[in-house]
């Protein structure tokens, strides 16, 4: 059944590529993957293979990639993606020697791909469970590790009808899981080789903090050198339901500067944001100058790649997505020692639950709750600072997963 599904997906991507640009990139990338390997793989080199579904999973695996590259330079790095949103952004990443799409998990694709590269070990990030690739690796005696994986009782592996697909888990040499619950769930189905290491994203956000960029236009906007400057609210990866809440509040409160980095930066969405803002001077980042940004009340970030550095300038952060499919990266904000607000769809995000538990994160359901929180942060600086310190301490306390993984791997 699994292989039938894989062939159906492959057929669907092929047909869809005729009409959809994203699927077209995926289809072409998958078709070219083995050719790229045959051209670029060095016959006598030893390759460590990392597979990430998309950009978020890549960021989880990145600390591990870079630590191996630093400590074990004798190995080459192969990095694969399933999604164009990962590959297209990171296809020129300098931390890997070869970067390709991963062809759909059919028996033939897996055999061809692994004949072309023959890695000495493989790391699959978080939710990547590709049976045919893993089965070929296992058959060859190649260690395969699941990194930053997290399991819940409602997943198919732990249902009475999921035992067949659960075979894929037995192909891994070891699991590096995020929490004890995941380890216990694996134990219940007879998998004992699991180590609780935490989430490598904590290491990654600390790396990002260390490498953060100074942004002169943002510093001008917040009037960074003024002793009486306004507080700064940063909304990261926001969607319209998020924006409708916080903009309603800020339309009535003039004592904050507001930076909005929406998840979607298309013109239609930017126009919607502008329509929600009342009686404030607004500047887009791509149109900002040292002159006009100083007088602005709202700075809209209409380009990618700046958000993790922009959080540095905030006093309170809001991370979007919690009124939709799920919140975005709260750790990028929390690492900067400020309170982090987010919507209610956060239950499957361990880092959000941890921030809520430790007092550095706050759940927002509506404008009334948002207003109560923001009013207190505005009026009680000691409280706001203390909550921010708790957020930062939470991130620091859970760093170190990368070293724990490497201490359990033979390189």
Where are these regions (language model features)?
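Structural alpha-helical scaffold elements that stabilize or flank donor/cofactor-binding regions
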Residues: 113-115, 168, 292, 310, ...
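Active-site and donor-binding regions of nucleotide-sugar-utilizing enzymes
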Residues: 14-211, 215-217, 224, 234, ...
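Hydrophobic beta-strand scaffold residues
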Residues: 142-144, 258, 282, 340
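Inter-lobe coupling/hinge segments of SF2-like helicase ATPases
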Residues: 202-206, 224, 233-287, 295, ...
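C-terminal alpha-helical cap of glycosyltransferases
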Residues: 398-411
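Catalytic binding pocket for nucleotide-activated donors in carbohydrate/polymer assembly enzymes
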Residues: 172, 188-189, 307-393
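Short, aromatic/basic amphipathic alpha-helical patches
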Residues: 89-94, 188, 270-279, 354
